[in-house]
Every structure is written in C-alpha cells, then in structure tokens.
Design a protein with these regions (language model features):
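N-terminal glycine-/serine-/threonine-rich beta1-alpha1-beta2 phosphate-ribose binding loop
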Residues: 1-147, 235-240, 277
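Glycine-rich beta-alpha junction loops
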Residues: 10, 54-58, 190-192, 217-224, ...
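C-terminal active-site/capping subdomain that shapes the small-molecule cofactor and substrate pocket
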Residues: 37, 275-358
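Short catalytic-loop micro-motif centered on adjacent basic/acidic residues
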Residues: 132-134, 158-161, 184-187, 215
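Adenosine-phosphate binding glycine-rich loop
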Residues: 173-175, 180-210, 216-220, 290-330
C-alpha cells in the first residue's frame, strides 16, 4: 500500500477520498472509467491508502475523515453515499493558510499538534508516510514551505497541488534532491479543466499555422477555493501559473507570446463546486483571415483535480522505489507550473512510458 497524508481536508481531499471509495468498489473497479492510468508501475488505484490528515477548521479537527469531508463549507460532488475512513484529522499550524476574509468561514483552530517542521516530521515518520499531498488554499506561501521543509526532514515525497513554487524553485528542488526525496509540482492541472483545454487549443492554433492575437480565460466558481481567491493579494502566483500553461507553448517554439489573461474572475456561491470557464481566442489564419473561438466549459472542480492527484501519488511512490529524487519529469504532464514545460504530446508520452515502467 501507498501511505498518504493530506494537508487540507476541503473539496479536493473529499473528491480524492470519495474516488478511492468509488474505485475500491467492485462494481466500479471493473471498468475504471475516469482514470488516466489504470496502473502506474505495479500500483493500481486501490493501492492508495490515506493514513494521515491535517486541517485547521474546528469543524474538521479531531473528527474522522469519513465525517470531516462533509463538514464546514465542503460542497464536493457526491460520488459515493459515504466513505469508510476513521483516520482522525489533526490540527495543523495556520501560518498564512487562512486569508483574513476567510476566518469566519474556516473557524480556525489554534492548537496545532506540532509547530516546527522538525516536530511535524516526527509525526510523518511515525505514520510511516510515503507521500504528502498539499491541498492548502491558494496564497499559502509560508504554510506550503513549512510542509516542504517537513517532507525533506521526514524524507516523505511531496505532491504540491497549489501555485506556491516549490518544484519549480531551484532552491527547494535542490533540497529535495539532496535529501533523496521525490517531488511533483507545482499547481495541479486538472484532467479536463480550463488549463489543459487552453494549452491544447493554443498548441493546435500554432501547429495549424495560425497567429494567436489574444487568449482570454475567465473562471467562475462557488467553492471555498474561489472565495479565497477574492483576496487579490493571494493571487500573484496563481495568475503566473495559469498563464504559464499558455505562454510556455510559444516559448517552446521560440515565439513571442500574445496577450494572455487567465485566472479566477468571480465567486458565485450558488455554483458550489461547479466551475465555469469562458475561453475567448482571436486568431489570424491564411491570408490574415480572422478566426474567433468562444468556448464554455462547465466541470465539477474537485473531482477534475482528484483524477490527476491519484496518478501523482502513484508516480511518486514508483519514483521512491527506483531511488529517484527531486522534481519528477512527469510534473510537466500533471502540473501548470512544472520546472520544465513541454508540449502536451511529449508530456503524455513521457508519463505513459513511466506508468508502463519502461
């Protein structure tokens, strides 16, 4: 089994835990639809086991995961009637993990089980953890670095799902490499979300000889992720990360990027975990003839993320088995802001070869 810890028991954690229950059920396990990879190396999805969990919300701390994923403001799409996981949620240090305007929503608890990376590393070691998944809110710079330091000390692989740059920061990349610890990051690129659709459309336009005049991506949602992002001061790295997906396709071809705008545009509570993306692209084709693309994408935000995280966990465990350390190359397939960007086809081929253990 792959022993996993989760930092942040919000909608994304709920989707991952529900997905483990869903695919662990024989009725659904037969088809395994909805997964990018059935096996990664020797590991099926059923090899993943969540054994440690952290949050700062009083409504989740000290409750079993099977209750905590439905507590507070969680509004994830329901995949299964319930999950069966009695692991108790531990209190994490808050640091900058809760935006000022979110304190009433999160009901933060201020009695963490450990306050230093050294003390927290001991907890991870005692739990015999293989992989830690960072699900902190966007803008949690100090908190993410706290957990990165903890993973280095505990020699636990880290999956950084948010746009705080760890894998793509040479300083942290070296820390993980020197400690012999694998790392995937930064900022999860959902299975079929705004970023991957933007990337593929940008690639298609370029490869079919078109000039991209502008590429505008606007996203609206009603979960706590979107509410948190109402605080513009927490969005600097998020905007860099989302726009990197588009701009990097021009950089790879030695071209100047067009006008690009990508990021959250509004929080609408009634949408819940539904995310609505509006894409607006203007191109110039043969003879300078204009092409205009308007596209609307509506997805369940958190399951869209979980479908990638479940692969990342297994890639990290496979890397541990092989003695690999530092940022993994599959980050280019799984994340918006990897250390090295690639074209979609190249990233997919690399991920497929690793999953096949070639």
């Amino acid at each position: 089994m792959i022993r996993v810890g989760l930092v942040g028991i919000g909608n994304c954690a709920s989707a991952l835990l529900q997905g483990l229950e869903y695919y662990g059920n024989a009725e659904h396990n037969n088809s395994l639809r909805g997964l990018t990879e059935t096996f990664i190396g020797p590991y099926p999805i059923t090899s993943v086991e969540v054994v440690l969990a952290f949050d700062v919300d009083k409504r989740k701390v000290n409750r079993p995961l099977e209750e905590a994923i439905y507590a507070g403001n969680n509004c994830c799409y329901t995949m299964v009637p319930r999950i069966y996981n009695s692991v108790k949620v531990l209190c994490a240090p808050i640091l900058d993990g809760v935006s000022e305007h979110m304190k009433d929503s999160f009901c933060p608890e201020s009695s963490p089980v450990a306050e230093s990376p050294e003390a927290m590393a001991q907890i991870l070691t005692e739990a015999k953890l293989d992989v830690l998944v960072n699900y902190l809110p966007v803008g949690s710079e100090q908190a993410t670095k706290f957990w990165a330091e903890t993973c280095v000390l505990a020699k636990v692989a880290m999956m950084n799902c948010i746009p705080v740059f760890i894998a793509s920061d040479p300083v942290y990349a070296d820390k993980f490499r020197e400690a012999g610890v694998p790392l995937i990051g930064d900022d999860i690129k959902s299975q079929f979300g705004a970023s991957i659709v933007s990337q593929v459309l940008e690639e298609l336009a370029i490869d079919r000889g078109h000039t991209v005049v502008y590429h505008v991506q606007q996203n609206t949602g009603g979960n706590t992720d979107f509410k948190n992002m109402l605080n513009q001061s927490r969005l600097v790295s998020k905007k860099i990360s989302k726009e990197n997906v588009i701009r990097s396709q021009h950089a790879l071809r030695g071209e100047h990027a067009p006008f690009v705008h990508a990021g959250p545009s509004d929080y609408v509570e009634v949408y819940g975990d539904t995310k609505i993306c509006q894409l607006d692209l203007e191109l110039k084709g043969f003879g300078g003839a204009p092409v205009h693309l308007d596209l609307k994408l509506r997805v369940q935000d958190s399951p869209n993320s979980a479908g990638v995280v479940i692969d990342g966990i297994r890639y990290l465990k496979l890397a541990q088995d092989k003695g690999l350390a530092g940022p993994l190359d599959v980050s280019s397939f799984l994340c918006k802001h990897p250390p090295t960007a690639t074209r979609f086809g190249q990233a997919k081929a690399l991920a497929r070869s690793v999953a096949s253990d070639l």
